Amino acid sequence: MPKNTKPLVFMITGVARAGKDTFAACLMEHFNGNGCRAEVFKFADVLKDRANDVLRAMGVFKAGERDFHAEEFKVRHRGLLVELGRTLRGVDKDIFARHLNAQIHMFLDYAPLDVRPVALVSDWRYLNEYLFLAKHLDAQIVTVEMQRPGYGPANDEEAGSLADMMASMQILHTRLAVDPAGVRAVASEI
């Protein structure tokens, strides 16, 4: 039987601090060098980049500190990112999916021919994002929900979007309820 060489896309969801990025990093480590080339993609990176542009324009940006990619700063000022994201989705509900789709297409188009490209989307939050990528990518999509005991939604926006996805459980393939130490073991089994 021939080996599956169709591009692979992991869409990882879960509440803030559930271990999505840790799981993606473990998958990247697992796939790279094993006949695959993996790269992490995030819907929210473009949002954080534009928020950082505002900080730069105001003369207060400081990499790693006053920076929306820095965890502590992001958590403290999450409200701005939530409102900006909500506003942009009001303009076009697929705005972030459309942007990420273009990034993944570029990754797939330029992947070496002798490797299987693996896109790891570590911040999937909305059902329409899955539906958009499933429609526009010729890839095998694997969805994963990360659950971490003791952690719940960071805000109402996160709670609502996760509830919408859970109502459409037929699209979820895998639900992982593991502590961060167990993530590496699970990733190595994929």
Q: Residue spans of the language-model regions?
A:
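Conserved lysine of the Walker
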Residues: 20
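Post-Walker A helix-loop "phosphate-sensing" segment adjacent to the P-loop in P-loop NTPases
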Residues: 29-39
